[in-house]
Amino acid sequence: MKLDFTRRTVLAGFSLMAAPEAVLAAADKAPAQGKKAMPEKSLYERLGGVFAIAAVVDHFSDAVVKNPIVGQESKNPQLREWHTKNLGRLPGLKFMRTLWVCNVSGGPYQFTATKPGATPLGLEEAHRNLRISPAEFDEVAAELGRTLDFAKVPKAEKSEVLAAFAAHKDEVTAGYAETKKQH
């Protein structure tokens, strides 16, 4: 099955941030000039909705499983085990990732963390036992970058997506940091 990736479908899957504050502030200060301002569509709507988001999440998730550093052949035993023994859970993970992106982009779907933690997204608890190192996190970010390149996402949007992803590094690597403190 060949997937058709467009800028819209890629951004739908990975763009996790709303419009930058500077753009919104400028829009608020612009004179109305006798016209009513159109209400801005949510990021979810602008990016194509759940089906576009799901297609991109699917591609990215499969790429991570196949990645030699963080996937099935990882030197990290927890990652390797998850990507081999729990591979049957991947469809559910794709579903959860899709809900998460839809939720944070203003869509109608509500993401609820399966392992709530200190943050509403529960990323630290969901990843704690995987003991993901900062270098492994960076490799997943690089895989995301390769996915965005594959889909021909423009440089500015790619940078925004990667910045949004990087914002969760401390949460995702919390289990690794705790392990290092214990030794």
Name every feature range the model reports, one short phrase each.
Residues 26-183:
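Core of compact, soluble alpha-helical bundle domains
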